[in-house]
């Protein structure tokens, strides 16, 4: 399994399985001299951890992070940073009934066909549990980006199933378990999830992520374009089946006279490009949306096959998220931050001394509609 590392200069390699003794990651390339404590990382992990509301898995994992290396006297040294998160609430017996059967919609069948061996306990390596160390690494990336460039990476749930969630204010996001930017709609979301759980079914979600303050110039054409790497990272999140940058698929129905973001001396007039042109950041907000599929682990009986190829019926029991999108916001934020810090370092390495006589215009013109 050779695809466990993300990044070029700032790299993150994750390890562990859902029901193993621990999960974690090794971060290489973090700049030295940044103040860092376990509490800095824990703040982000607490936003993602399970068991925080009745609408998510009731697996009770404290997700307490340990920094094993790369930090001395509270400061990063430039050496690899190892983060460890111990698993404490595994219930492997819940998965005994699927040891010989493939769960529809999961990685069971493909992992078995590719590797010839499968850890069926909670999905093993393919579990969304492995997003915890990604969030830990993302906490470090977000801190460096904020302190070095003033970049803020924030996200929110913009749709739960067929329920669209109009954006009201960022302050609402941290006040509810859905990361919804609209407090008035939360009771409707709660009723929706309660009915879904009663039916033994699941649903998908859309998450929007915004990075503000990214300078113009980040991105490495042709094949490491900033938006290409963002899409690559977002598709590495469990259950993500679609990624949009800026207007995304809405661009199909837009005319060039609408979609093209005009430039004026006072700033850009629009941001349909989502903050990236030619694979390089424009200085505008980078806007990303991801589509998350419904959880495959549901109580409704589903047809499948056994390892011997015989027909079978699968009913999934245990502790599962009826919508994995509810906890996906900090994960998507972390992925975007990891791509941005990597490109910040790559830009500094090759083009740090480049200057242009053309003034850098504002992210948005004052009179832009």
Curated annotation (Swiss-Prot):
A GO cellular component entry from the record: cytosol
Gene3D superfamilies (alphabetical): Chorismate synthase AroC (3.60.150.10)
Cofactor note: Reduced FMN (FMNH(2)).
Keywords: Amino-acid biosynthesis, Aromatic amino acid biosynthesis, FAD, Flavoprotein, FMN, Lyase, NADP
Keyword Lyase: yes
Primary role: This reaction introduces a second double bond into the aromatic ring system.
Quaternary structure note: Homotetramer.
Family statement: Belongs to the chorismate synthase family.
Protein name (Swiss-Prot/TrEMBL): Chorismate synthase
Organism: Burkholderia mallei (strain ATCC 23344)
Phylogenetic lineage: Bacteria, Pseudomonadati, Pseudomonadota, Betaproteobacteria, Burkholderiales
Gene giving rise to this polypeptide: aroC
């Amino acid at each position: 399994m050779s695809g466990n590392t993300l990044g070029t200069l700032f790299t993150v390699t994750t390890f562990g399985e859902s029901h193993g003794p621990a999960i974690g990651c090794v971060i290489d390339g973090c700049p030295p001299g940044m103040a860092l404590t376990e509490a800095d990382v824990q703040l982000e992990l607490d936003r993602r951890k399970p068991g925080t509301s009745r609408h998510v898995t009731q697996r009770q994992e404290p997700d307490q992070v340990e920094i094993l290396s790369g930090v001395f006297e509270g400061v990063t040294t430039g050496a690899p940073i190892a983060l460890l998160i111990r698993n404490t609430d595994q219930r492997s017996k819940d998965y005994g009934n699927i040891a010989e059967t493939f769960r529809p919609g999961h990685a069971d069948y493909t992992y078995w066909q590719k590797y010839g061996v499968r850890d069926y306990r909670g999905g093993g390596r393919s579990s969304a549990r492995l997003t915890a160390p990604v969030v830990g690494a993302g906490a470090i990336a977000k801190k460096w980006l904020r302190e070095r460039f003033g970049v803020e990476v924030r996200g929110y749930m913009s749709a739960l199933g067929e329920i669209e969630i109009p954006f009201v204010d960022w302050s609402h996001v941290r006040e509810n378990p859905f990361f919804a930017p609209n407090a008035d709609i939360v009771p409707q979301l709660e009723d929706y999830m309660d009915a879904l759980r009663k039916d033994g079914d699941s649903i998908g979600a859309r998450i929007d992520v915004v990075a503000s303050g990214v300078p113009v110039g980040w991105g490495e054409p042709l094949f490491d374009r900033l938006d290409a790497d963002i899409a690559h990272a977002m598709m590495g999140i469990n259950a993500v089946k679609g990624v949009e940058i800026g207007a995304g698929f809405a661009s199909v129905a837009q005319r060039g006279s609408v979609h093209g973001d005009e430039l004026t001396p006072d700033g850009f007039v629009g941001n349909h490009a989502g903050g990236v042109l030619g694979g390089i950041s424009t200085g505008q907000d980078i806007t990303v949306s991801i589509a998350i599929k419904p959880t495959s682990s549901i109580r409704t009986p589903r047809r499948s096959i056994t390892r011997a190829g015989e027909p079978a019926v699968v009913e999934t029991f245990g502790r599962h998220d009826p919508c994995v999108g509810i906890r996906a916001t900090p994960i998507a934020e972390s992925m975007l931050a990891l791509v941005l810090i990597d490109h910040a370092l790559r830009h500094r390495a090759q083009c740090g001394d480049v200057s242009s006589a053309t003034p850098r215009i504002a992210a948005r013109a004052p009179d832009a509609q």
